[in-house]
Amino acid sequence: MVNRTEAAQLLKHLDRDKSGKISSQELMEFLHTVNCPFKKEQVEKFIKQHDKDGDGQLNTDELLDVLCS
């Protein structure tokens, strides 16, 4: 099970522009590096499903919810 600290570390690793959030582009780049490419529409849909504050990106709390559900 992932805890808040681990989720924050993952966010920091994925957050290339250091905004404190993961954009669809950052998530797509990560998925591509682990040989798990998704279409942009799929990634955007995933983020939209888990984006509680409606900003189009995933923050630490939202990422934690995804990883622990």
UniProtKB/Swiss-Prot annotation:
Matches recorded under CDD domains: EFh (cd00051)
Disulfide-linked positions: none
Family annotation (SMART domains): EFh
The keyword Repeat appears for this protein: yes
Calcium listed as a keyword: yes
InterPro entries assigned to the protein according to its UniProt record, in alphabetical order: EF-hand-dom_pair, EF_Hand_1_Ca_BS, EF_hand_dom
Gene3D superfamilies per record: EF-hand (1.10.238.10)
Residue intervals of the EF-hand domain: 2-37, 38-69
UniProt name for this protein: Calcium-binding protein
GO molecular function, one term: calcium ion binding
Residue positions binding Ca(2+) 1: D15, D17, S19, K21, E26
Top-rank taxon: Eukaryota
Residues annotated to bind Ca(2+) 2: D51, D53, D55, Q57, E62
